[in-house]
């Protein structure tokens, strides 16, 4: 896979060949940024962008969930906007509700709505400004708009920018697409308000981040409980210690999920890896042993709940600051 090339210690020959294109890409991205910033839409409601400068999963959605919960605990009214990757809504902006399947609104919005108990309005649209205008009209008393991703959506003015970094992978070879994993040059970090580094941030990587920004928060993803897809029963995190299970992951970085299960002492009999944003059907599980316990990510569970078996569980997680 191309991301394996991006994250190799040495610059691979393919990345070297693509580096001129990456240079052109970064220049185009920079010019686009300036053009859009000159005609930004500024909302009266504060906007917090939770994004990243690299492609793939860095942990943005758990951060969005954490921010939303914090505002709820403070008695405030947050609203979330999202691109809704893979969404098939009939019209946009589209507001998610309890009956909206992930196939209509996208994986992350469906998961966030479920995780937050429907207490936070979630609006999706390919054009975030349209979502903001929808919120201004329908939720004029909202205290804050949290954008799940959208750092590069410069048409929308923002009050605060938070960049999420995978502390274990950092920025790979440091090149922009397509030669590397970066959407923007790493120097972009100099202008953001905060960096949240998720995972094991060693001294070398911490020093690298300090070259660009001093407001760095260390965090880790903590497993909190297992939840049954059918009954919604929650059980303790050590409930499957020493037990053999099938693990299912259709996320940007499945190894993280498998490592989490390993750390919990779960014996993974088989790792089933699907593409990120995979649209599950019962056929995907026809070859599974019906007696074997299945554990998947929350994001996958949202798409499997309609045909789940009684021995299917998902691992719930939370962000914990170090």
From Swiss-Prot:
Q: Has keyword Phosphoprotein?
A: no
A Pfam match: LpxK
Q: Does the keyword ATP-binding apply?
A: yes
Q: In which pathway does it act?
A: Glycolipid biosynthesis; lipid IV(A) biosynthesis; lipid IV(A) from (3R)-3-hydroxytetradecanoyl-[acyl-carrier-protein] and UDP-N-acetyl-alpha-D-glucosamine: step 6/6
Entry GO terms, CC: plasma membrane
According to its UniProt record, this protein's enzyme class is transferase
Gene Ontology MF term list: ATP binding; tetraacyldisaccharide 4'-kinase activity
Q: Which domain of life is it from?
A: Bacteria
The chemistry this enzyme catalyses reads: a lipid A disaccharide + ATP = a lipid IVA + ADP + H(+)
Task: Cite the EC number.
Answer: 2.7.1.130
The GO biological-process annotations, alphabetized, read as: lipid A biosynthetic process; lipopolysaccharide core region biosynthetic process
Which residues of the sequence carry a binding annotation for ATP?
54-61
Q: Which UniProt keywords apply?
A: ATP-binding, Kinase, Lipid A biosynthesis, Lipid biosynthesis, Lipid metabolism, Nucleotide-binding, Transferase
Q: What is the purpose of this protein?
A: Transfers the gamma-phosphate of ATP to the 4'-position of a tetraacyldisaccharide 1-phosphate intermediate (termed DS-1-P) to form tetraacyldisaccharide 1,4'-bis-phosphate (lipid IVA).
Per the record, the similarity remark reads: Belongs to the LpxK family.
Q: Which PANTHER family match?
A: TETRAACYLDISACCHARIDE 4'-KINASE (PTHR42724), TETRAACYLDISACCHARIDE 4'-KINASE, MITOCHONDRIAL-RELATED (PTHR42724:SF1)
What is this protein's name? Tetraacyldisaccharide 4'-kinase
Taxonomic lineage of this organism? Bacteria, Pseudomonadati, Pseudomonadota, Gammaproteobacteria, Thiotrichales
């Amino acid at each position: 896979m191309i991301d394996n090339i991006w994250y190799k210690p040495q610059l691979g020959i393919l990345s070297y060949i693509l580096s001129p294109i990456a240079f052109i890409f970064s220049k185009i991205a920079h010019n686009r940024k300036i053009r859009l910033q000159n005609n930004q839409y500024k909302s009266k409601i504060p906007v917090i962008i939770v994004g990243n400068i690299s492609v793939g999963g860095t942990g943005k959605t758990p951060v969005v969930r954490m921010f939303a919960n914090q505002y709820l605990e403070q008695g405030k009214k947050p609203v979330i906007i999202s691109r809704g990757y893979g969404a098939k809504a009939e019209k946009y902006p589209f507001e998610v509700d309890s009956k909206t399947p992930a196939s209509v609104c996208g994986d992350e919005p469906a998961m966030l709505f479920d995780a937050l108990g429907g207490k936070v309005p979630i609006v999706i649209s390919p054009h975030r400004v349209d979502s903001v205008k929808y919120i201004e009209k329908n939720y004029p008393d909202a205290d804050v708009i949290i954008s799940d991703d959208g750092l590069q959506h410069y048409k929308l003015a923002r009050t605060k920018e938070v960049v999420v970094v995978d502390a274990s992978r950092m920025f790979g070879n440091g090149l922009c697409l397509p030669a590397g994993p970066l959407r923007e040059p790493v120097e972009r970090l100099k202008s953001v308000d905060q960096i949240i580094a998720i995972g094991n941030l060693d001294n070398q990587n911490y020093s690298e981040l300090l070259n660009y920004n001093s407001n760095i928060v260390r965090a880790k993803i903590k497993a909190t409980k297992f939840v049954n897809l059918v009954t919604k029963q929650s059980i303790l995190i050590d409930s499957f210690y020493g037990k053999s299970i099938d693990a299912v992951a259709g996320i940007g970085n499945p190894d993280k999920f498998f490592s989490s299960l390993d750390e919990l002492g779960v014996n993974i009999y088989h790792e089933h890896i699907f593409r990120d944003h995979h649209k599950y059907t019962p056929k995907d599980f026809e070859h599974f042993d019906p007696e074997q316990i299945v554990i998947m990510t929350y994001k996958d569970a949202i798409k499997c709940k309609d045909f789940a078996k009684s021995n299917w569980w998902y691992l719930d997680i939370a962000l914990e600051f170090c």
